[in-house]
Amino acid sequence: MQGELTPLKDQVFPIPNCLICYMCKKKMKMKRSKSLSPKASNSEEDMKRTRLEETEVANDIITHPHILDFSDDVLLNIFKYLNPKDLMAISLSCQRLAQIVQDKTLWKRVDFREKPILLSDLKEYIKFLQPITTNLAIRGDLYRENDTELSPCFFNSIKNTCTQLKELIIEEYCINADKIQITDFPGTIEKLSLEGCKMGYLRSNKSYFFKMNFHMPNLTCLILSNCQWFTPHSLLVISKMPKLKELRLNSCHRLGECVAYASLATRFGFKTLEILDLRDTTLGDSEVGCFSCTKTLTHLYLECPSSLRNTDAGDQEPRPLQREILNQPPVYEDVNVAQFLVEDGFRWENYMFERCLITDRAICALGSDTCDRRIINNSAEGVIVVEEDKRIFNNPHLKTLVVRNYPHVTNSSLVHLASNASSLEYLDVSGTSVTRQGVETFKSQRSNVKIVTSFDET
């Protein structure tokens, strides 16, 4: 039967600005013939001619089937399995399919990331969006196109059209921070991803996410992976998000030594944070240890940057870090000073390479720990009475912990986690200095935990 199908180009007839397919033309011809009001005739010859035409049409449908023989409901059910780009291609074939493709049920979850979308083509994609569109994902190409800067018109179109938008994913585009503020994004979204985006014209005295907690009160997931413009002081603003559960900052290479910001953010914010991704950053023990105060944390991902692996501090060439301009103004958050840029003449030559590495100190800060016991009474000669041991449960619900390629993570971390991380279900210590014996001991104590090590790869 497939061999008898008529090619699509032979089934369509071009007319100005649109196409009429073979089946559409046949139906239109039948409608026109019925509207001509033929003369009344009861002759037997006319009846035979009518039956003959009906038989020919039926035989033609059987021998030359067309997709347009299906009803609109059947076609709509078929189209729901196609991706948005295929739907757009089908809409160009004929008028009937174009009308079906525009059905709002097909455009509730829209993901255009299969191929990069150039800015010149973006308008053609936006016109298919509907008020009930809840998910929108687009991807550009920073290396293919010189001008990939999103316009304010794009964000206005989304805000005005997609009034129920819950998820917005924008990858590998340029955003002009002087023209587009965080308040220009739809305030209804619950998930925002700017993975791989470039941000230009950022203000030095204010975080790009300033007052984001008021504009997006329902945001639960924020993905800023590979955003090289993200700076540590923005942690203070993000920590104020009242419903934030997932934060991904992996490959944000400017996220380095920031114990002051991390301490304030975790002490007064991140009250609902569950998933934290800090892989491929230069955060150290002090910063990671601050998140031990986040009681809701269940998933923590840490991995040493590839540029810092297998490197000995003594063998490194001096690499002084670039220093900020001395007279640059401080950064303000909510009228409070959040960041000072200080230049004290200290030469940052190979300043403690280990400072950028996670060690047992950070891992042992996670989970429960025994606090210092208070002396109750020492009045009796030679007798000191102290209070009973108390345990502080910092992360009682930590379920997933990934600590990869840190040479200063040893068996001490395994011993601590075996005793104190009671909710742990998954542990990845690949590339660390744990021993095979230490892993076997951990497995014997916590058989319910799936542990991934470098020994599994050999």
Regions found by a protein language model. Name each.
Residues 72, 87-104:
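Short helix-loop-helix/strand-helix junction enriched in hydrophobic and basic residues
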Residues 116-121, 142-153, 172-180, 198-207, ...:
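Short, solvent-exposed loop/turn at the beta-strand->alpha-helix junction
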Residues 114, 140, 172, 191, ...:
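Structural position within Leucine-Rich Repeats
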Residues 103-106, 129-135, 160-167, 184-193, ...:
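Leucine-rich repeat
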Residues 111-166:
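F-box-proximal linker/hinge
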Residues 99, 124-128, 153-160, 180-184, ...:
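Recurring C-terminal helix/loop segment of individual leucine-rich repeat
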Residues 1-69, 341-346, 458:
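CRL adaptor-proximal regions
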Residues 70-82, 96-98, 110:
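Short hydrophobic alpha-helical "box" of cullin-RING ligase substrate receptors
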